A protein has these predicted regions:
Chain B
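Bacterial Sec-exported substrate-binding components of ABC uptake systems
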Residues: 2-71, 135, 166-198, 308-316
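A short, structured surface patch at a secondary-structure boundary
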Residues: 64-126, 223-226
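Short secondary-structure boundary segments
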Residues: 69, 125-126, 146, 201-203, ...
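Short, solvent-exposed loop/turn elements at domain surfaces
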Residues: 73-78, 93-97, 205-209, 253-254, ...
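Proline-aspartate-enriched helix->loop->beta-strand connector
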Residues: 109-123, 139, 240-255
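Extracytoplasmic ligand-binding site segments that recognize negatively charged/polar headgroups
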Residues: 129, 143-160, 192-217, 260-262
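Structured C-terminal subdomain patch of bacterial secreted/periplasmic proteins
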Residues: 152-153, 157-162, 171, 251, ...
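His/Asp/Glu-enriched short active-site or ligand-binding loop at hydrolase and phosphoryl-transfer sites
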Residues: 212-235
Length: 335, 316
């Protein structure tokens, strides 16, 4: 099952690499990619400029899309498992609103001449996302008095609302950065070559690895905390750890791609409808399906208005929603 | 084309007259121009709903003008109505010494505007129902939306002149700017013919097509806009990086080169951009963002700057 899904994901990534606005012929791109393999020598006939487009612009974008999609999907699945709430998504505890605030402040400061280079916005978004979730957690604990997840989620609603208000306030004060802020909020698979990929890769790797490690634990915990505790699992700690790594990964990918919605909720549910709710299959398949989904969405974003961009957040929602309804219908028919 | 709204005011008839006069004057000026076409085209489309009236005598001209648009502010001062301006919005910073306040043209606050007791409010976009608010309190206004082309900008100069009692100066100003632009085109001497360019609004590659106001200025020099391939996405599309690199423009103009912004060096460091003709030939140029985004009297300066860049280009 997982091997087949991995093959599909690979095919999607490969296909996405053949498509683009610069009119490279798919066959020469394939030849160029094959030429990069060890012991293979094919002359692709691409100019130096075309090779640069493929290796430094298009391929990193596809890879980044895969990393962002995989992380959002697996983080969403983890959140849904931890909160035992099918509507939970990685943005539940305010990470996106916090990141939006951080990014907006930095974009505005950049326009005013802060000059932190291209790293400024991702770093600020990352910090904003982490701070927002930490605030949610601490607030939830202090007012919740042990009433568990519901209070944390409600605290997240409050923190997100506050961060959104602050973000809007900053945005209104500095109108000349309006378009940059707006574009960031809609999401875009940034194309800073490989630097964005290397920036998020460690976080993505840790997030996916840790969440996958706990896939059986989550299955046990879904039976109930008492049963889990009798097997030596400490549910509260596992929850905290999983929320922490899912948040870390989400904050990292959001900081380079902006706010891309719908992936964290649609992909895990689509996978569940196919293979059932068990985390043992759900989590690894969410990684693969998330990568495929976002890379495909980016292909649409790159082709529909080519050579102009369509914000990828628009695409994930526009193709995600109908697709999701189809899956839902088939899923309910099967049960 | 002309949306004429019923203005609920005692002087509605007069205002309509003023509108007609202003428009006629615009047409006359345009007709005097160098074989101009009908200016009513372009994306700036609608004739401004000028509820302001032409003063009967110089003494009747508005004396407490509030401007909520940097372009309008520049036009007001250029036609000699600067002394009649009491407040301008937070984005207006030219010419030096304009009475900048914290008024916003994007999120206009009617109460704050009325605090200056204006007898004329000039703005570009009808944000936050500004127009109906001003209608309600009976304050005359003049809307100057982004014009679709240069002739549209000239019309606005004329309109501002008529409404503020400086019709002659406005007429002169149009002549001067026309003169400046044609001198710039002569100076470039066809050096721009057939060259391709990319005009960058921000680092995420928002740009303009030839259908935009600024794109028209470039077209005067025979420059070809690489973004025209994306005109399906409007006059201000966001281009894909791989397209810009593969389109390989001869010239890149940066309207996002303010402090902390982009520079020829930062463009050269973008992945895959080092081989672009403009980068290789040192033809990445920073432009003053204010001059490129406003449709005021400094259009001529922009044209001169472009002419200078083309003239300095090696091999011309």
């Amino acid at each position: 099952m997982i091997a087949a899904a991995a093959a599909v994901t690979f095919a999607v990534l490969l296909t996405a690499t053949l498509v683009g606005a610069s009119g490279l012929s798919p066959s020469s791109v394939l030849a160029e990619l094959a030429d990069a393999l060890p012991l293979v020598h094919i002359d692709s006939g691409l100019t130096t400029q075309q090779q640069a487009i493929l290796w430094q612009i298009r391929l990193p974008r596809v890879v980044l899309g895969a990393l962002v999609g995989a992380t959002l999907a697996v983080a969403g699945a983890a959140y849904q498992g931890v909160f035992r709430n099918p509507l939970a998504d990685p943005y539940l505890l305010g990470v996106s609103s916090g990141a939006g605030l951080g990014a907006t402040v930095m974009i505005v400061a950049g326009a005013a001449g802060a000059g932190m280079g291209s790293l400024g916005v991702p770093v600020a978004a990352f910090a904003g996302g982490i701070v927002a979730v930490a605030a949610t957690y601490l607030l939830g604990r202090s007012v919740g008095g042990g009433r568990g997840e519901v209070v944390i989620i409600l605290a997240g609603v409050a923190v997100a609302a506050f961060a959104n208000a602050a973000q809007t306030f900053v945005q209104q004060r500095y109108q000349d950065s309006l378009q940059s802020v707006y574009a960031w909020l809609l999401g875009r698979l940034s194309t800073d070559g490989w630097s964005d990929v290397t920036l998020v890769l460690p976080y993505v790797a840790v997030t996916i690895a840790v969440i996958l490690l706990f896939r059986r634990t989550l299955d046990v915990m879904s039976v109930g905390d008492v049963e889990a505790a009798s097997l030596g699992i400490r549910p509260a700690r596992v929850r905290l750890l999983l929320v922490a790594v899912a948040t870390l990964g989400t904050a990292a990918v959001v900081s380079v791609s902006g706010l891309i919605g719908f992936v964290g909720i649609v992909v895990p549910h689509a996978v569940r409808l196919v293979v059932g709710p068990g985390h043992r299959l759900l989590l690894p398949l969410s990684v693969l399906a998330g990568a495929s989904f976002l890379v495909l969405a980016d292909v649409v974003a790159r082709t529909i208005m080519s050579p102009a961009e369509l914000p990828i957040g628009v695409v994930t929602a526009a193709i995600g929603a109908p697709f999701f309804l189809v899956v839902l219908r088939r899923g309910t028919g099967m049960q | 084309m002309l949306h004429h709204r019923l203005v609920h005011s005692r002087r509605a008839a007069l205002r309509m007259c003023a509108l007609v006069i202003a428009l006629l004057l615009g047409m006359v000026l345009t007709a005097c121009g160098s074989g101009a076409e009908d200016p009513a085209g372009g994306s700036g489309g609608d004739a401004p709903g000028a509820a302001a009236e032409a003063p009967g005598s110089p003494g009747d001209a508005p004396q407490r003008i509030v401007s909520l648009s940097p372009s309008a502010t520049e036009i007001l001062y250029a036609v000699g109505a600067g002394d009649q301006v009491v407040a301008v919005d937070d984005q207006s910073d030219y010419p030096q010494g304009v009475p900048t306040t914290d008024l916003s043209g994007y999120t206009p606050n009617l109460e704050a505007i009325l605090g200056y007791q204006p007898d004329l409010v000039v703005f570009s976009d009808d944000n936050g129902d500004l127009k109906s608010g001003l209608d309600r309190v009976g304050v005359p206004y003049l809307q100057l939306p982004a014009p679709g082309d240069i002739e549209g900008a000239y019309e606005q100069f004329a309109q501002v002149g008529v409404v503020t009692g400086h019709a002659d100066e406005a007429h002169e100003l149009v002549g001067e700017v026309r003169e400046q632009i044609s001198a710039a085109i002569d100076a470039a001497g066809g050096a721009g013919e057939g060259l391709t360019y990319f005009h960058e609004l921000d680092p995420t590659l928002y740009t303009v097509t030839s259908a935009s106001f600024i794109g028209q200025v470039y077209s005067l020099f025979g420059l070809q806009n690489i973004a025209d391939a994306a005109s399906g996405a409007g006059a201000y599309p966001q281009l894909q990086p791989e397209f810009v690199v593969s389109a390989n423009p001869d010239l890149i103009f940066l309207a996002d080169a303010q402090a902390g912004g982009e520079s020829p060096a930062s463009v050269a460091q973008r992945p895959g951009w080092a081989g672009v003709t403009a980068v290789r030939d040192g033809q990445v140029h920073a432009l003053d963002a204010d001059i490129t985004s406003r449709w005021g009297p400094r259009i001529g300066d922009l044209a001169q700057r472009i002419a200078q860049i083309l003239a300095d280009r090696p091999g011309t």
